Regions:
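Extended, helix-rich architectural segments
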Residues: 1-79
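Structured, contiguous alpha/beta core segments that scaffold functional sites
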Residues: 52-57, 61-166
Length: 166
């Protein structure tokens, strides 16, 4: 179908040459480059690009994984990981204030066995996890240790293939 081909070509034009980051050499920039490399961002960028062109909205969730390491060139208790959240598998609930600033973000998913529904909500202050199983919902609230919503949200008004629909 034309829609799929339009998305493939647009993604190829946007991501065929990997993004190049530049900054003055520093330990922080080196660590940043290692995070990008270890998370295989070239592949993720392509997936994000494709999904936003298909669905008009996709999110990238960043989270720490506890693991004593020196992978980024400095001693750390954590590895930074990310996950692409597409409407194909997740329900996304961004919430904005009157100035279009993201003030909270929710993501809902169902386990592969369809036995649990998990809704996670992120604010600058806290991370909420609501788990529903067999009609019973449990709630867990943890402080958001980074003080920011750990999500990069990508949106566009219409899918890239909109003009061939009509």
């Amino acid at each position: 179908p034309y829609q799929k081909r339009i998305v493939e070509i647009a993604t190829m034009f946007q991501t065929a040459i990997p993004y190049k980051y530049t900054a003055e050499d520093s330990a922080l920039f080196t660590a940043f480059q290692e995070v990008i490399k270890s998370n295989k961002m070239n592949f993720s960028d392509s997936k994000i690009c494709t999904e936003v062109k298909r669905y008009t909205q996709v999110a990238e969730l960043w989270y720490p994984e506890e693991d004593q390491n020196e992978q980024y060139g400095v001693p750390s208790k954590f590895l930074l990981r990310h996950k692409v959240l597409s409407p194909e598998k997740y329900k996304l609930y961004p919430r904005f204030d009157d100035n279009d600033n993201l003030i909270s973000f929710g993501v809902e998913s169902t386990t592969k066995d369809n036995k649990k529904t998990i809704l996670q909500g992120f604010t600058n202050e806290e991370v909420y996890t609501f788990t529903t199983e067999n009609g019973q919902t449990t709630t867990e609230v943890k402080p958001n240790i980074i003080g920011k919503i750990p999500v990069v949200l990508y949106q566009q008004d219409k899918p890239d293939w909109d003009s061939v629909q009509h």
